[in-house]
Amino acid sequence: MKKIVLMCAAVAMLCACTKSEERTYRVTVEHPHKDCPVVVTEVPAWAESVVVKADGVELPSQLDKCLAEAAFVADVESVKEFEVIFSEKPSTTEYAPRTNAQMWWKTGDEANPYEEKDTLYSFKDDMYRKLHHHGPAIESEWGAYRVYFDKKQTIDTYGKKKGQLELRESMWYSTPEQLSAGFGHDNLRVFGSIGVGVLKGWDAEEKKMIHITDFERREARVLAKGPVRAIMEMEVEGWNYAGRKIGMTSRYTIFAGHSDVVVENFLEGDVEGLTFVTGVMKMLDTQSIKEERAVAQIGCDHPENDYTKWPKETVALAVALPEEVEILSAEDDQLSYLYQLTPNAEGVIKYHFDMNWRKSEWLSSLSDEELLTDVLAKAKAAAEPIVVERVK
């Protein structure tokens, strides 16, 4: 009995010594936000888990140690405070996943054809056909996106018919049985366009986009898979662009409850004064709205080259640029509606993009014009500032 008592006392002392830190954060928004994405920075290096509460109720959250950030989503009308507790003890709580990220290496083994990877790199432009769905992909319940691991690094879109996670089952290419069960599918052919929301180089004299062809190393990464946000990155080192050797990391983040994506481009080296472009592609039967800091288009085209199998799809795309982004011009090319941008003093260009799809059940009652104005409004709302400040 004495031995048991001593053991219990030792366990109690161990529990009492577990390191933790409780903070209070205030989140402020300009307009009401459902599933407002909140990111807490300056996470303690020793933290292994996080718990977030609002009005005493625990909210799903995640700790992304590779970024030293914690993230959660919550409904915020105007101003709301949250209790954030960091602990050195790993979490035993599993929240229902609302986001996913994945990248699959083709093994060549018929029994196990794909191996999931979080990081892949190459010194050549040879990865496009070595990866299933050609690069990393992220999804929420409302949409999915992949980035091509090639010289274009274009974003491609996957529409959802129902609000659900499904990429780990469909693997981007839904089977006839899955389509019959209400799965979504690839709904866009990007050709040589900007697609939606990727950052590319720009040749001002030729008035055309520049792909990443001359480089030293390129890497694709999955940084976070959920439950409340998923993150993928594409990094290029030693890119010979406009007579300079630079580096660029493009980070794409999708949050639970959102179809919009946050894009953060981090540029390194001698990038002052360089021009880059982003925007949305033009499509057949297109309608568009182009404003000073946001552009949207809706069009109809076949998502694949097999026209008999894949009928035309109606897709609306939008990009919105926050006030802090420096816009040099807004000159389009033949395939895309574009903005010419330059990085800020820290070498960063940040913006948001979004997609609407005619076959999404929650959008089926909208006209084409309403799909267009809705996707533009969502992208612009996503680009509004969300202020997160520690108050205790």
PLM region descriptions:
Residues 49-70, 240, 284-302, 319-329:
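Solvent-exposed beta-strand/loop surfaces of large extracellular or lumenal domains
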Residues 15-16:
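C-terminal motif of bacterial Sec signal peptides marking the signal peptidase cleavage site
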